[in-house]
């Protein structure tokens, strides 16, 4: 399953199921294949892009997000924390994503992460979040974790999450772009800190 997850840069991912799932598409190329499902975790401009959703959206595409996302993008179906939806062979559950140490992403804003259960694997996309008590309930096979800090997990925080969740694979996100706050060196430092606890996949940027 790990080879069917493609990092598109920043917080954007493509999961090739079926169904075809995009998470937070931003600055993506237009595709001849419409998404089956598009997941939007927060209402930030770099995660909630109307233009990018429209590039990927077809007549039957389902877009899921919180109430703030609904205010920015037309025809978004509401997904609440711990609510699960099923599409084809995938189950998608909303997970609270928020800051504790700072007010960058307050819990009241309703930010989401996602647990995507597909082909007998549980994939956890953390979103913009620090370590939260809700993570105690998640034991994924694959974890996608930010490492850029700024109200979300930084490298030490992401390492602590891996120690708590024990995933088999981890993909660091939110690094390498201009103004990102985390670099390839940070991604490598994260991999070194994880050691043998999990397999860390440092993807090549597609843009």
Task: Give the role of each language-model region.
Residues 5-6, 74-87, 108, 136, ...:
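Binuclear metal-ion centers of metallo-dependent hydrolases, dominated by the metallo-beta-lactamase
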Residues 27-28, 44-45, 68-70, 81-85, ...:
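Short, acidic/turn-prone active-site loops that include or flank metal/cofactor-
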Residues 23, 39-40, 93-97, 145, ...:
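Redox-cofactor binding/interface segments in oxidoreductases and associated redox assembly factors
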Residues 115-182:
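Metallo-beta-lactamase
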Residues 12, 50-57, 113, 135-136, ...:
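Short amphipathic alpha-helical segments and helix-helix/interface helices
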Residues 1-33, 78-138, 153, 204-207:
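Core dinuclear metal-dependent hydrolase active-site scaffold
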Residues 35-41, 61, 73-92, 141, ...:
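Active-site regions of enzymes building and remodeling cell-envelope glycoconjugates
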Residues 26-71, 139-144, 166:
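Active-site metal-binding motif and surrounding structural segment of the metallo-beta-lactamase
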């Amino acid at each position: 399953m790990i080879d069917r997850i493609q990092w598109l840069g920043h917080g954007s991912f493509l999961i090739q199921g079926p169904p075809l799932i995009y998470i937070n598409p931003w600055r993506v190329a237009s595709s001849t294949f419409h998404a089956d499902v598009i997941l939007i975790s927060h209402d930030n401009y770099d995660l909630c892009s109307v233009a990018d959703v429209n590039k990927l959206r077809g007549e039957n595409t389902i877009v899921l997000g919180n109430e703030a996302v609904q205010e920015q993008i037309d025809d978004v179906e509401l997904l609440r924390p711990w609510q699960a939806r099923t599409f084809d062979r995938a189950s998608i559950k909303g997970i609270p994503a928020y800051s504790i140490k700072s007010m960058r992403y307050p819990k009241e804003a309703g930010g989401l992460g996602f647990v995507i259960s597909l082909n007998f694997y549980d994939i956890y996309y953390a979103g913009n979040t620090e370590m939260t008590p809700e993570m105690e309930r998640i034991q994924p096979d694959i974890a996608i974790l930010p490492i850029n800090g700024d109200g979300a997990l930084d490298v030490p925080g992401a390492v602590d999450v891996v120690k708590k969740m024990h995933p088999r694979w981890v993909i660091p996100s939110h690094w390498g772009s201009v103004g990102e706050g985390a670099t390839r060196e940070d991604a490598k430092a994260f991999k070194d800190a994880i050691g043998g606890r999990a397999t860390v996949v440092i993807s090549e940027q597609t843009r």
